[in-house]
Each structure stands twice: as structure tokens, then as C-alpha cells.
Amino acid sequence: MSVRGSLIPHIARAAGFVLLMLTLAASLCPPARAQVIGTQSAVGGVLVDADGMLTRATLDDLGKLEQARRELTDAIPEDLRQTNQLLKISLRGLDEAIARCRDRGEPLPAEILCLGGLQKIRYVFVYPDENDVVLAGPAEAWKVNRQGAIVGATTGRPVLLLDDLVTALRAANGSVRTVISCSIDPTADGLRRWASFRQGLRPGLDPQTVAMAMERQLGPQEISVTGVPESSHYARVMVAADYRMKSIGMGFEPAPIPGLPSAMDLVPSRSRAAANMPRWWLAPDYEPLLRDAEGLSWEIRGGSVKAMAESDFLDGAGSRRHSGKADPASQRWANLMTERYDDLALADPVFGQLRNCMDLAVASALIAKENLLEKAQVSLPMLMGSAGVQTASLPAPKQVASRAQVTRKNRAMVACGGVEINPWTIVEHAETSDALAAVRTEAALERPAGNWRD
């Protein structure tokens, strides 16, 4: 019998959307499945319907979440209720614990689904004598916040999820090393329609009228995902973060923190107009890794997110052209987004979830590039095998309605861009530190033998 640690949907109707409010539950049926708490249809404040259309979700009916909060909190083991500056997770032990649940026909417990409350991967240790690879970082007890995200009970920082770990490990160990990315962009047909339409616009039209016409002519924008399954929770986090970034940057929604205006607010009234297609994307921002001389101890440093900008323009034939640089307002906004990202990630958890996904991608790429599993002589059939844990399968995001905005120069604009995670360039750079060997030894002494976590 296979184990299915899944989440049973509770349907709540709010603002015209059918939202899937998922609570901790389990049912037994093949294939092996470990869908994670928090991988609901509405992720990061966006909803994707059966046709792949992405829309902004609202969570007015918070009463449905109250039961999930209670169940999730009650499921925390007593020894995980305290903040842990360095929680160690044995990948071998985790894989074996999942297999035991499968063999016994038991659901996966919340502590496995939430990876013990781990919030960041700071170290990766290899123990050849124990045939093990260990992930280590800060952790704390968790809760479900009002946005439906699983976050630390005291810090509010999102926790890492088993589902995303499995997705990242399998992506890094594929036959081809690919970049993980998502992009939301106008279609080529839509751009041609708009280019043809705007040639007939007469001067002096109301800018809002022009913006509405631009939205109609462009039609739905395409959503593309590479490197991970487009139906995965990992992919949904990327798309949701991209959508939220553009909503804030274009001024459709205010930032949930002070000091982050929209890019529209940064366009000087007397300056040249900004590009009609600003392109913003989010990327990892890491320092070079640290390693010991033997390559058995690794420290992942930095671990933040940066916003990048470039200005695109539409030529007369309706083709999008890259300028190779950003207009001043777009670049200034990207700089502010980067500076305020940590605060934004606390106020809007999807940005913290994206940072977690980047952490998992870097750790997984490191394990693959340095052959750490081979060094430890360990296999992880449940985490990495095709017959092991089956990750969440959500409606794949395919398109989203175009939204145009009017600048202070009365010019209609529409944003494009996405998320780009290239962990391979990050793990190519490492510096050697003799101090890491002692950290690895201490971590081994503190971790109880035979357990998947300390």
C-alpha cells in the first residue's frame, strides 16, 4: 500500500472565486503522494482556474482557515516548538522516514511536510561514514498566517516545504542542467494587433481610453515555465511572485510596506517618457559558497533576491525590441525592490516562498554538481525516484489578462518579465574555509543517530 499525505480541499466561495482551502488530512491510495500543506489552488494571492487563467484571489472567508491553523499548530511535536538556530535534516533519514510511512500505510506527518520548520539552508554536510547528506539551517515552530502561507510562529518567515524540496532535487538531477524560470509576456499576435491599432489613434485621446484599448488589443498574456513541472507548487510560487511584483511595480496595488512606491510614481513629470514595456525579473543574489578542503562541508551565503530591469520597445511592425538597458524610473524601482525585498518577504509571504525555492535550487544544484550523494554512497529513492514521493499537481498557469497603466507623461505601459533561477552559476563559485570542518563535526555530534532531524 502507498502512502498519500495529502490535503483535502474545503470549498469556500469568496468574491466570486471558488477557493480551495486545504486542511491537514490524509487518505490512502496509489500512487505514492506527499502533497504539502499550503499547496492549495490559491498560492501567493493568485488563483488559476481549470483553463489556466491566472487571476487575483481574495480570502475574505478566513473562518475556513481557522481549522487549518488549529490542526497545523496541534501537529507540531513538542521538541520543535522552540526556535532552533541550526536544525539538521538527514536526507537519508528523511527518505527512510517517508518509506516507513508508506510501508505502514500511514500519512506523512506535518513535521515532515514542513521539514521540521526549516526556514533557510545555510549548510550542506556530507558524512561518508554514515552514508548521509545533511541540510542545516535556522528553524522554528510554524503557523498558517492570514494569507494562507505556512510561516514561522515568531518571525513570520515562510518555512521550506517537502514538496518544493522534492521538485528542486529532481530538477537538479535531470539529464540536462536547466535554468528554472517563469515569464509573463504579451503574445506576438497581441503585439502586432496593438502596433496596427495604435497607428490609427488620433492625438489627444484620453490616456485611460488608450490604456483600455491597449489591454483589449494585447489580449491575454502568455505564462511560461521552464526547469520544473508547470503544475508544481514550485512553479506556482514563481508565477505568483512575478504577478505580485508587476502589480506593485505598475501601481495596480500598493506595496504592503512603506518606502516602495510604484515605478509609475518614480517617472518625473518633466522627463522623457519611460519605456512602453518595462521588463522586470527576479533572480537569486548569493555570495560565493564556502567549502572545506575535502568538499564535505559547504556553506550557502547571502541568499537574497534581486530585481533586474530592462526597457523593451515595440517597433512599427509589432516586434518587441530589447534596449539592453533600463530607463531611469524602471531601474530605480528595481533597486528599491532589491533593497526592500527582505521586508517585503515578511509582509507578502510569496516573496519569502520564492526565496526559499531559490535556496532549495542552490542546495540541490550543489548536491548534483559536487556528486555529494555519490561521496556519501547513499541513494534517495523516495525523494528522487520516479516511484517515490509524488509532488502536488495544481492547474498549470497558462495566461493572464493584460493590464496597462498610464504614466505621469500620459503614456500607456504594460510590463513583462518573470523569475530566473540559475543555481548552476552560483555553485560554480566557492572559497575554501578551514573553519567549516569543525562546524560539520559539531553538527554530527548533535544529531541523534537514526533520526531524520536533531
Indicate residue ranges for each PLM-predicted region.
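Signal peptide processing junction and immediate N-terminal pro/mature segment
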Residues: 26-34
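Extended, solvent-exposed polar beta/coil surface segments
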Residues: 1, 17-19, 35
